[in-house]
Curated annotation (Swiss-Prot):
GO terms for biological process: DNA-templated transcription termination; transcription antitermination. Involved in transcription antitermination. Required for transcription of ribosomal RNA (rRNA) genes. Binds specifically to the boxA antiterminator sequence of the ribosomal RNA (rrn) operons. One of its GO terms (cellular component) is cytosol. Pfam families: NusB. This is Transcription antitermination protein NusB. Belongs to the NusB family. One of its GO terms (molecular function) is RNA binding. It comes from the Bacteria. Keywords: RNA-binding, Transcription, Transcription antitermination, Transcription regulation. The gene is nusB.
Length: 168
């Protein structure tokens, strides 16, 4: 028996692979961006995500669910961000930067009760998303804003994500 044949026989078999949280965050960010550019485009967003990101309909719809929850909480998220940003305004940031801030702040606040995501993970993900979708020069402001907010207890959200969260 060859080594490859024995490796295949011993390899664990999974029914389906879980959707990676990093990929979910990327899809949510892309959906937030698309809806900020075209607020009326939600109807075609699932098919757009399926085509452009090569994901299943289920995963695209799952990302859209998070996008809707973030948008439902956007006034509260933006108020907290505006109160924290000192050197500029939220409106002067790029669309991607604003939406990275909103998404990470939402995830931080959403998951406080059930399964908090460590702040270090959120900061690392923020850095990764900035490098992938924006420019690295903007990262210092984004990270400073999130760091300042994460140092304080998270206020409750008016419209929490139900029935699940980004926990799993």
């Amino acid at each position: 028996m060859s080594v490859m044949a024995s490796d295949k026989a011993c390899a664990p078999v999974r029914a389906s692979r879980p959707f990676p949280k990093q990929k979910l965050r990327e899809l949510v960010l892309q959906a937030l961006y698309a809806l900020e550019i075209d607020p009326e485009g939600e109807d075609s967003l699932v098919s757009l995500l399926m085509t452009e990101a090569s994901v299943s309909k289920k995963n695209a719809a799952y990302a859209l669910m998070f996008c809707r929850a973030i948008r439902a909480n956007q006034p509260d998220l933006d108020a907290l961000l505006d109160a924290t940003i000192r050197t500029t305004t939220l409106a002067r940031l790029t669309i991607i930067e604003r939406n990275i801030l909103r998404m990470m702040l939402f995830e931080h606040q959403q998951n406080q009760d059930c399964c908090p995501v460590p702040v270090a993970v959120l900061i690392a993900e923020t850095t990764r998303l900035i490098k992938k979708f924006s420019y690295s020069e903007g990262s210092s402001l984004i990270l400073a804003v999130l760091g300042s907010i994460f140092d304080h207890p998270a206020p409750a959200l008016d419209a929490p994500l139900e029935p699940t969260s980004m926990c799993g």
